[in-house]
Amino acid sequence: MNRLAKTDYSRWRMLDEDGKHTWHYLDDDEAARTWPQTLADKYYLGLPLDLPDLPTATSPLDSAINGLKFFSKLQLPPGNWGCEYGGPMFLLPGVVIAWVVTETPIPQAYAIEIKNYLMARANPVDGGWGLHSEGDSSVFGTSLNYTVLRLLGVDSEHPVMVQARGLLHRLGGALNAPHWSKFWLAVLGVCDWEVVNPVPPEAWLLPDWVPVAPWRWWVHIRQVFLPMSWIWSKRWTAAETDVVRALRRELFVQPWESIEWAAHRNDIAPTDNYHPKSWLLNSVNWILSNIWIPYLRPRSLATRAEDWVSKLIDMEDANSDYADLASVNGPLNMIVCYIRDGPDSYSVRRHRERMEEFLWVNKEGMLANGTNGVQCWDTAFLIQAVWSAGLAEDAQFKPMLVQALEFLDRQQIRENCQDQGVCYRHVRKGAWAFSNRDQGYGVSDCISEALKAVIVLQKEADGYPQLLEDQRIFDAVDTLLTYQNPSGGCASYEPTRGSEYLEMLNTAEVFGRIMVEYDYPECTSAVLTALVLFSKHWPDYRREEIQTFIQRGVDFIKRAQRPDGSWYGSWAVCFTYGTMFALECLRSAGETYENSEHVRRGCEFLLSKQREDGGWSESFQSCEQMTYIEHPTGSQVVQTAFAIIAVLSVDYPDVEPIHRGVRMIMSRQQRNGEWLQEGIEGIFNKSCAITYPNYKFIFPILALGKFGRKYPHLV
């Protein structure tokens, strides 16, 4: 009873259809024979690669070349690179619950490997699950992942379940879960809807001028709130099953029948309460629950709101061909379509197909990615890394880079959204998304990094095809120029639309800084460096606007510097990441260690954090606590590369500490050229860590190559 099944990993294949990644399990021997496993498949799955040792690197540039030789073998046929984008432990539950309540068959191989992944990720000390894979156990993670395992057939008396249930009960049971968990359990029928704080669709009927109107919110929270509000308003619950009845007994510390659900709407365990509800949100929830909904809410208004929300959901689906923004709103949109259109409708069938792209298989099992991948993002960075290392004209890497350029060519978004203004979407013509063109959301730094990658190959390297004509480059720049906020900084998906005071209405509880867009030093820096590079080759295009944009952006970067000289990074770990971007930005504006106090302070901050072994060590906890915290396992290859790139970019004069960091990175390289996985690299919303496993190749290659070009005599 205690041992779980395992699939035959030699039968898994990852299919890349021009950036659309799906995993397939081949039961049929003939199918497995005719579709052989690739080296990339084996790498993702943790299978032996049996690659020969490379010649021992005798210089940093040799080490960069060895790393690139290994990483080039992982390039996928369309020209991009793939990887898991995991870490958050609340994503799989949304996918699995959506499958269950929409009568979507779950392939046996999927069920087996999801169970294996969750078992592998259970906290080895207390048996629970956290917000993310490296976080402390929480009611959010434990209640939802316990539920997933039970839905997939794990017995309640399995030792893992017994331990997890014991922890959950010590934390107060599922009534102490945050809002999102209570919502999912209500959809499933494990909780009563009375325990879920209001998610009124009427908010979408507010005039655009209202300061709290949802169009002003950050795109991820508004696209999650959108289907949530429709489902909440319908109070829809899936059909009751034996497993649901069992979960009602298992997830709570009191008899299910005796629970006064409304009295527990605001209950939350201290482990989960990262962003406590404000007095304003509590007041709004009380008024909605006790006055508006029972006494004042006209059914006609609710219907009108539901109809408008339904149309907005359809626009989101249409503008992404059902790929949707990410792996939280995608499953929710599918549930809406199932309730509204029926299980056999085109909308549900297409959602089922596209949800496959959120899934990934690694050596531990099957997980859900944070989006449908990081394809454009990683590919753009890799191109720039090879260029910066001086290897773009090396014949052995040119075919790889041509393929990568062709991928970015095909992935550029060529048109704005249908009904762009109606569905509150930002301009996107000429943009690149984080993952692929289908997903369709331009992001300021994704556009910038892809644009830089295209320009360095088409304008600065010899012998590359001119795939993007000038007008397409101009389209990207035109879109970039829409991202600057009045502060001079740039946000992510769109300029800031609302006040930071909207955080007082943050209902998620487990995340911070999610209600509106913010100025991000790394996004601002990416845009500015892209515009500087663009202006080098097209100096007359929108010259004055670009110069003004750059100056205002540089002023923002300087203001964003913290008293200790660092910059906070919101999208990766953390101060090393943010400081790398900021220093590269200042260098693009002509500032170096010699002539800029801001640069000197940034370098001094980084050098103050260097460890005895030459490396840098930073934990995701830096992002949570907004102060530099070292990783408990010591120096990290990725953060060391960030720091080296930063100080090299601004001509830090003392080569000795940089050389020590370079030697540390070289010492971690395996004989086949790879670097092994270390601590989690990414973060979002201050509190949730997420993986960027290709960073351990891209940034060390960039750091080593950059150092090797600048100091070719040092080994």
Swiss-Prot record:
The keyword Membrane applies. Keywords: Endoplasmic reticulum, Isomerase, Lipid biosynthesis, Lipid droplet, Lipid metabolism, Membrane, Repeat, Steroid biosynthesis, Steroid metabolism, Sterol biosynthesis, Sterol metabolism. Pathway: Steroid metabolism; ergosterol biosynthesis. GO terms for cellular component: endoplasmic reticulum membrane; lipid droplet. Disulfide bonds: none annotated. It comes from the Eukaryota. It catalyses: (S)-2,3-epoxysqualene = lanosterol. Pfam families: SQHop_cyclase_C, SQHop_cyclase_N. The keyword Lipid biosynthesis applies. Its EC number is 5.4.99.7. GO terms for biological process: ergosterol biosynthetic process; triterpenoid biosynthetic process. GO terms for molecular function: lanosterol synthase activity. The active site is at residue 445. InterPro entries: SQ_cyclase_C, SQ_cyclase_N, Squalene_cyclase, Terpene_synthase_CS, Terpenoid_cyclase/PrenylTrfase. In Aspergillus, the biosynthesis pathway of the sterol precursors leading to the prevalent sterol ergosterol differs from yeast. The ring system of lanosterol in S.cerevisiae is firstly demethylised in three enzymatic steps leading to the intermediate zymosterol and secondly a methyl group is added to zymosterol by the sterol 24-C-methyltransferase to form fecosterol. In Aspergillus, lanosterol is firstly transmethylated by the sterol 24-C-methyltransferase leading to the intermediate eburicol and secondly demethylated in three steps to form fecosterol. Belongs to the terpene cyclase/mutase family. Lanosterol synthase; part of the third module of ergosterol biosynthesis pathway that includes the late steps of the pathway. ERG7A and ERG7B catalyze the cyclization of (S)-2,3 oxidosqualene to lanosterol, a reaction that forms the sterol core. The third module or late pathway involves the ergosterol synthesis itself through consecutive reactions that mainly occur in the endoplasmic reticulum (ER) membrane. Firstly, the squalene synthase erg9 catalyzes the condensation of 2 farnesyl pyrophosphate moieties to form squalene, which is the precursor of all steroids. This is Lanosterol synthase erg7B.
